[in-house]
Amino acid sequence: MTPENFAAIAAEGYNHIPVTRELLADLDTPLSCYVKVANGPYSYLLESAAQGGEKWSRYSMVGLPAKKILKVFGHEIVLEEEGVEVDRFECTDPLEYVEQFQLQYRYPPIEGLPIYTGGLVGYFGYDSMRYVEKRLADSTPPDVIGTPDILLMVSNDVVVFDSVKGKIHLITHANPENAAAYQNAQERLDEMVGKMQRNIPASVLTPEKGPVVHEEDFVSSYGEEQFTHDVDRIKDYIREGDVMQVVLSQRMSILFEGEPLNLYRALRSLNPSPYMYYMHLDDFHIVSSSPEILARLDNGAVTVRPLAGTRRRGRTETEDLQLEAELLADPKEIAEHLMLIDLGRNDIGRICKVGSVEVSEMMTVERYAHVMHIASNVAGAIVESGSAMDLLRATLPVGTLSGAPKVRALEIIDEFEPEKRGIFGGAVGYLSWNGNMDTAIAIRTAVIKDHKLYIQAGAGVVADSVPALEWKETMNKARSIFQAVAMTESGLGVRDSSENPRMSNEDEERVVVPGDASA
């Protein structure tokens, strides 16, 4: 962009103008770029592996440390700039505040830019649903971890990798109200280029080893006895016709002194997934390899994609195909998947144009490193007055993390789960400056805070659930994090099961409870 182009766009009234530079992407990876240019508080790395983890998707995003941060605790808004709190106030509707906050950044439509150039990046926790479902506003379980209900970074300096075109886009933003804005933006891009040319620190190349980790070292805040007892109590609700399904979850924790970035490196190696993210949020970190979209808005097109129904991967291609056929022939799996499709259609139907909602992909099988899931695509066209926040209000939390009917299931979750879910089950991703949104469900996700690592997983309780198998299902879903922690503490060396037999992958022999692939 030339100074003349910049001035012309500014004359149209835009105050948040992207200024970019391109490099070849043949000498760096998104991970090495993150280490060199971003690794610090309020930074992030977003990556994506295609189905099965066999190849990486087109775009990866690196966010440099953000200067402005928006946090929400209940109904209290906290604004920070460069590490200093600048405002704190009460707000009736935090979701409405977030929407209005973003509108102050007037972003121009410019062709030729990558799908993402920056925006509000972070998460909306599971408990954000209480801003929408007023009857649940006062039933929040105790908050043990203490993370904000919402945290969003104002991400203006980003590096976007385009693996198809082999390019790296360096992007910053400038406000023309500052006479030197364009020149300052060019200087920031120069600085980014300089950082890209650095060497990777030796500490990253030689990670330290920690203690040997076993699965039983993770401590549940729920406990198997109480969890299985509560599964039976939920089945009573189901028999009485009060609810059809409830996704009950348990949280596990372990002392963790390792580097969170190394945990991400381990997890992306062990379990590549469509939504992989590492977020350094000052006093805590989020590390995740989520298989499931929560909601996406792309130029008016709405997408949700229920995952429900699970089988392990076969040891051979023949066995893999046999397990797929078994999965698609299981009437219980199919019935529960159809229920979740209906929930998705109902959710987005509230904010989409009449007649636009359709099931664009029906019950395909997606394969990942250890499991396969039934997946369907539900799509629609958002109403003319609709926004990304309207879509988030309509979909959070998704049925695969709550149950059906949704509101009654949410009430039952509050009744039984001993701790506030927090980030688990919420939405992690971005609201881009151009009005689009892409968010994943916060599952297969570790939260690291105060030298402890937390992982949470759930199971869908239905009328014929076996309590012991529901408990086992939560353990199986957490296993990718268990293994990643063990690999991190080994110095990122790969331990096989003979070296650490209690961390073996029981997915090979597990019994799968139908209909709860996501949680």
Predicted features by range, described:
Residues M1-A519:
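Extended alpha-helical targeting/anchoring segments
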